[in-house]
């Protein structure tokens, strides 16, 4: 059995260490108090800056150790999609329309072919998200970086009265899941350390090689969510990234009673190799890359809109009692 912490990513330890940076960052809010761009207190996935009738939403994220798989097989044309997806999917959680991004690419040494392939993914991701890449930084650091690191910072905009905070979520609301394309960009450290030493990247599983499963690009949910926001009163939005279903706690203090889809593909392979169910749901998206919370009255219309883009399904309901229960797998996070 291998857990995320044993693989080298101890989220509890990280959270404890991170509090020092968070505390320092919060103290800087006073530097913009009463000025244009004053930080708001209502963001969860993205920070919100006050710009009159609008909030400017801002977030930052990266591809993580997925780049190690790309490097191992010499295929870099999709990690740009991943980086953009990780950022824009966070922006839409507050109801913001993503508009622009700057990238950060840290490398040991320049390689034209790698740059060309990364650029293809960045362009494809930007097109899908409807954003402009307006700048960036390439850091060549042979003494510090042994490989590659790709990250970005994205901004979006939302009218103040249209921010999605989760405050409208009520017990009984419908919880809808939008399918993921696979592992996305979270849990790669655990997946790599568990599977690659045992099978190798060319191992075939369900007619696909392992590296293909691991490099499948993160799905971008901008188009379906923006259309949904125009048609239905959305109560809450959650990007299911690092932390798996625990991300739902970011949008409300109410609980969730869910029935998750069958464990298939890369998740089935990981589970078959000894990762317990609770750890699976704590680390991976488990086939659900994005969650939408709406009233029961709006459920059918929401499903109709979302299914025009990606397979979407009712997962369950919001409950009065806190905690997340995956009823069909007997998993509880209280």
From Swiss-Prot:
Keywords: ATP-binding, Cytoplasm, Ligase, Nucleotide-binding, Purine biosynthesis. It is an enzyme of class 6 (ligase). Pathway: Purine metabolism; IMP biosynthesis via de novo pathway; 5-amino-1-(5-phospho-D-ribosyl)imidazole from N(2)-formyl-N(1)-(5-phospho-D-ribosyl)glycinamide: step 2/2. It catalyses: 2-formamido-N(1)-(5-O-phospho-beta-D-ribosyl)acetamidine + ATP = 5-amino-1-(5-phospho-beta-D-ribosyl)imidazole + ADP + phosphate + H(+). Its main location: cytoplasm. The keyword Nucleotide-binding applies. It comes from the Archaea. Its EC number is 6.3.3.1. It holds the Pfam family AIRS. GO terms for cellular component: cytosol. One of its GO terms (biological process) is 'de novo' IMP biosynthetic process. One of its GO terms (molecular function) is phosphoribosylamine-glycine ligase activity. HAMAP family: AIRS (MF_00741). This is Phosphoribosylformylglycinamidine cyclo-ligase. It comes from Pyrococcus furiosus (strain ATCC 43587 / DSM 3638 / JCM 8422 / Vc1). The gene is purM.
């Amino acid at each position: 059995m291998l857990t995320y912490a044993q693989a080298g990513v101890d989220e509890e330890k990280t959270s404890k260490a991170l509090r020092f940076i968070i505390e320092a960052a919060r103290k800087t809010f006073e530097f913009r108090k009463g000025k244009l761009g004053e930080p708001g207190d209502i963001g969860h996935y993205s920070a919100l800056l006050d710009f009159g009738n609008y909030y400017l939403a801002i977030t930052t994220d990266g591809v993580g150790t997925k780049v190690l798989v790309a490097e191992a097989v010499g295929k870099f044309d999709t990690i740009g999609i991943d980086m953009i997806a990780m950022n824009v999917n966070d922006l839409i959680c507050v109801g913001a329309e993503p508009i622009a991004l700057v990238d950060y690419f840290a490398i040991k040494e320049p390689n034209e072919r790698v740059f060309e392939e990364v650029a293809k993914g960045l362009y494809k991701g930007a097109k899908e998200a409807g954003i402009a890449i307006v700048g960036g930084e390439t850091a060549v650091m042979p003494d510090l970086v042994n490989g590659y690191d790709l990250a970005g910072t994205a901004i979006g905009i939302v009218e103040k009265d249209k921010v999605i905070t989760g405050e409208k979520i009520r017990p009984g609301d419908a919880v809808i899941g939008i399918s993921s394309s696979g592992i996305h960009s979270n849990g790669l450290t655990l997946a790599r350390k568990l599977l690659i030493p045992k099978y190798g990247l060319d191992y075939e599983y369900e007619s696909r090689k392992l590296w293909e499963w691991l490099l499948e690009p993160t799905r971008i949910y901008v188009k379906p969510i923006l259309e949904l926001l125009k048609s239905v009163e959305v109560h809450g939005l959650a990007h299911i990234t690092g932390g798996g279903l625990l991300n739902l706690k970011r949008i409300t203090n109410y609980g969730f009673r869910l029935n998750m889809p069958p464990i298939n593909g890369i998740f089935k392979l990981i589970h078959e190799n000894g990762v317990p169910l609770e750890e699976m749901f704590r680390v991976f998206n488990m086939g659900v890359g994005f969650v939408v919370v709406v009233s029961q009255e709006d459920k059918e219309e929401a499903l109709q809109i979302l299914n025009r883009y990606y397979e979407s399904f009712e997962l369950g309901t919001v409950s009065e009692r806190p905690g997340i229960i995956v009823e069909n797998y007997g998993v509880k996070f209280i």
